[in-house]
């Protein structure tokens, strides 16, 4: 297992006990990420367990196949870091998590919206500094606002239902229309129409060649001035440079990111004692909205 954290060890060790799923299997844990320099750790193993920031390009897969690996098990839903054509050519089976807890991600998405709207993060910091002023902490009623859900898969569908229960007017964009959402009152529209109508935009779609930089300068121009944007999908759904300019001009009124386009060198590590050399990320951290 590459990119192994203490919580990974605890979860896998708890599940890897005799009698639960047959005989226990031998698991080798490595904190290092999988790449050409670390692929040797997997010499002779049948299965490699990888995470979102591990390198599963053709070069790495060829080295894995040469050393006897026949399966790559992703402990994530996304697979854009895997060269699937190379895996098929090499006879390596690739499996993934079909979905994280859809409810957990959907609830987190809603929590980010409420945090932005009600300025909960700012209020928390003020109270710790014994500043009990309410100035600048006023939000808006989400009831009656238009929310655009971009992607209505397992997670997006739950987000749409949660927003409907908050009495938002929910519009959605997805190539596949879910009749259950339509019956609830969700209206499916084209992407530009969804962005133009929405006070709140949430991205819950996969990353592929069609959705890369889905939110860019052109699509931002179609959005309502002051709209809220939340991304709990994939980092590269957003053109970070374009979003930064929109934040600066307040065309995007507020932004919540659970993912980031260049997160591979940042996330899942303690960077508190380091200088961030990613200028876009550093700029994002300076904005109050």
Regions found by a protein language model. Give the residues of each.
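An N-terminal-biased, well-structured beta-alpha scaffold segment characteristic
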Residues: 1-94, 216
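Phosphate-binding beta-alpha-beta segment of Rossmann-like dinucleotide-binding domains, i.e.
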Residues: 90-92, 98-146, 158-161, 165
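Short beta->alpha connector loops at strand-helix junctions that form conserved
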Residues: 51, 75-76, 92-103, 192, ...
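Short glycine-/small-residue-rich Rossmann-like dinucleotide-binding loops
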Residues: 52-53, 199, 205-207, 233-234, ...
């Amino acid at each position: 297992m590459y990119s192994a954290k203490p919580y990974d060890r605890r979860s896998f060790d708890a599940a890897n006990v005799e009698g639960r799923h047959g005989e226990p299997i031998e698991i080798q844990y490595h904190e290092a990420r999988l790449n050409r320099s670390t692929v040797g750790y997997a010499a002779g193993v049948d299965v490699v367990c990888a995470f979102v920031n591990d390198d599963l390009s053709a070069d790495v897969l060829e080295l894995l196949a040469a050393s006897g690996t026949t399966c790559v098990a992703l402990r994530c839903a996304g697979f854009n870091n895997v060269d699937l054509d190379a895996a098929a050519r090499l006879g390596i089976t690739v499996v993934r998590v079909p979905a994280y807890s859809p409810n957990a991600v959907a609830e987190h998405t809603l929590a980010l919206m409420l945090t932005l709207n009600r300025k909960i993060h700012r209020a928390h910091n003020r109270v710790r500094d014994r500043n009990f002023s309410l100035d600048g902490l006023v939000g808006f009623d989400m009831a009656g606002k238009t929310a655009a859900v971009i992607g209505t898969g397992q997670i997006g569908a739950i987000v749409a239902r949660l927003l409907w229960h908050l009495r938002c007017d929910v519009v959605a964009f997805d190539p596949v229309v879910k009749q259950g959402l339509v019956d609830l009152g969700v209206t499916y529209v084209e992407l530009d129409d969804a962005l133009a109508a929405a006070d709140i935009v949430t991205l819950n779609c996969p990353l592929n060649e069609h959705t890369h930089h889905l939110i860019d300068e052109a699509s931002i121009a179609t959005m309502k001035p002051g709209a809220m944007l939340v991304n709990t999908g994939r980092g590269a759904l957003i053109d970070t440079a374009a979003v930064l300019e929109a934040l600066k001009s307040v065309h995007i009124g507020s932004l919540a990111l659970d993912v980031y386009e260049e997160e591979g060198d940042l996330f899942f590590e303690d960077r508190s004692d380091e200088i961030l050399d990613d200028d876009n990320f550093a700029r994002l951290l300076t904005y109050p909205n």
